[in-house]
Amino acid sequence: MKLFNTMNIDKFDRVAFIGGLLATIITSTGMFLMGHISGLEAKDLITSSLPRLNTFFNTVVLGSATILTLLLTLTNISSGSKSTLKETYYKRILKIAKLDASVFIVSVITFLLMNNPLIEADSIDMKYYSYLYYVWSSISSIVCGAIVAVIIMLY
């Protein structure tokens, strides 16, 4: 916890960071173990996990877009009201919006890249499928941790 104190991170950000980090570690460990324990070749792993990863990134895109829309609505409603809100309120919303926008952008780009028919290409060396599986697994684990952090920040 000394690390967080030296970086001037408040409790709000610390809890979200720890929750996101735990989600990233758990999902990446699970995908790493699945890659080693299953006994499948990398191309088969990609083929079997691709529909689920597409669904995951599609869901994250929809969820993060909804959160951004609701945050925008919230700021418009609060700025139009006669009550005055604290500056920290708007700073918290801005932090959430920045992280959520990053999650949205990474998810959209990854979702589009995953829909390229690389699996059906015969000229690709088999060792690249292993790299591709671990890259997609790493990106999905990081996005999972980031969306968990956004949800914790909303709480």
Predicted regions and their residues:
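N-terminal intrinsically disordered, cationic/polar leader segments
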Residues: 3-17, 30-54, 62, 155
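Membrane-helix interface motif
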Residues: 30-44, 100, 110-122
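Transmembrane alpha-helix detector for multi-pass membrane proteins
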Residues: 50-116
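Membrane-interface interhelical loops and short amphipathic "cap" helices
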Residues: 40-56, 85, 118-131
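Membrane-interface helix-loop-helix modules in multi-pass inner-membrane proteins
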Residues: 103-139
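Alpha-helical membrane-embedded segments
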Residues: 133-155
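Alpha-helical transmembrane segments and their helix-start/interface "positive-inside/aromatic belt" motifs
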Residues: 2-24, 90-100
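Hydrophobic core of alpha-helical transmembrane segments in multi-pass integral membrane proteins
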Residues: 18-33, 105-109, 143-148
